Amino acid sequence: MKKQRIVVKIGSSSLADSHEGISKEQLSDHVAALARLKEEGHEVLLITSGAVAAGFSALGYPSRPVTIKGKQAAAAVGQSLLMQAYTEEFRKYGIVTAQLLLTRSDFSRKEQYSNAYATLGELLNRSALPIINENDSISLEELTFGDNDMLSALVSGLVSADMLMIFTDVNGLYDKNPQKNEDAKKYYFLPEVTEEIASLAGDAGSKLGTGGMKSKVDAAKTALSLGVSVFIGTGRGQEKFVDVLKGKGDGTYVGNAPQKEMKINKQWIALHSVVSGQIEIDAGAATAIIQHGKSLLPAGVTNVSGFFQVGEVVEVMTQQGRVIGKGQCTYSAEELRDVKGMQSQQIQARGERHNYEVIHRDYWVSF
């Protein structure tokens, strides 16, 4: 089996004991299976939930708190306890762990996004196992990543993973709720996430988790768009993750055919960047960009909206108002208003620029 880069996401429901806390037995089971992946020569990143579950009892809560401040307080206590438990277990296998706590803003700010990419790459090069969680104790919005399902998809794209394994307490995707319908049909393989499949996933998670199957399906769709195949399911024992790679996992495989990965800068533009303005273009420019993969030139620009600076991301729309994509603009809004509609030779004659693309094709994402 060739060496692969694997992202494994373990949700709260796959870590919890009967009292809603963290089960040492389950955690040990997961660690043993992750160590087997490493033993087989694979690079492994772990996305783990469970900070709230690990910390609420230490603060005297009788059960998992329901308020945002209660969850964040429990996460602040539980994250260190959770990391300590993982570190002690991985040490038995001689594996060095590293902790990364991320929020949405770490993805939306390009410098932080690039730093996360560089740090993860270096950790993997040094054979460490990164353990990643949302920074629940300071996140501004409740349940930002949906029990880390979307976080796992975004990280898998960031590191160009070969596979994302989302482990939960349900053994895959069904056409209806298997707990309520005996005739529920299980999907063993889905080539893609269609609107029909997305609509079948329920909204509610388990009592212990926050994601539910809908967030897992959404995460799978995002991962596929980034060139990463996905497995959603469950399992026990030391071989469970290796079995997934062998096609023997207890769950649903989604899009396991080779996918074209999206470059890091385009991932940031497509999924994380904040749009600072809009550019309207003519039909010829739209055809050149979408059908022929060309860069956007000033000659094709017909209107500029907003007040953006050089390097900020803008949406691009047709004269009929249809948004066709977005990209990083090499002009400020003021500069672009001054040169819109001009041919490159005209701009060159003014002696103001040596870079004539408004948006270079390497910094463009089509919708």
UniProtKB/Swiss-Prot annotation:
PUA domain ranges (all copies): 276-350
One MF term in the entry's GO annotations: glutamate 5-kinase activity
Pathway note: Amino-acid biosynthesis; L-proline biosynthesis; L-glutamate 5-semialdehyde from L-glutamate: step 1/2
Alphabetical list of SMART domains matching this protein: PUA
GO CC, alphabetical: cytosol
Entries under InterPro entries matching the protein: AceGlu_kinase-like_sf, Asp/Glu/Uridylate_kinase, G5K_ProB, Glu/AcGlu_kinase, Glu_5kinase, Glu_5kinase/COase_Synthase, Glutamate_5-kinase_CS, PUA
GO BP terms in the entry: L-proline biosynthetic process
Catalysis performed (reactions): L-glutamate + ATP = L-glutamyl 5-phosphate + ADP
EC number from the UniProt entry: 2.7.2.11
Cross-referenced Pfam families: AA_kinase (PF00696), PUA (PF01472)
Sorted UniProt keywords: Amino-acid biosynthesis, ATP-binding, Cytoplasm, Kinase, Nucleotide-binding, Proline biosynthesis, Transferase
Role this protein plays: Catalyzes the transfer of a phosphate group to glutamate to form L-glutamate 5-phosphate.
Family that this chain belongs to: Belongs to the glutamate 5-kinase family.
Protein name: Glutamate 5-kinase
Species, as recorded: Bacillus anthracis
Lineage per the UniProt record: Bacteria, Bacillati, Bacillota, Bacilli, Bacillales
Gene coding for it: proB
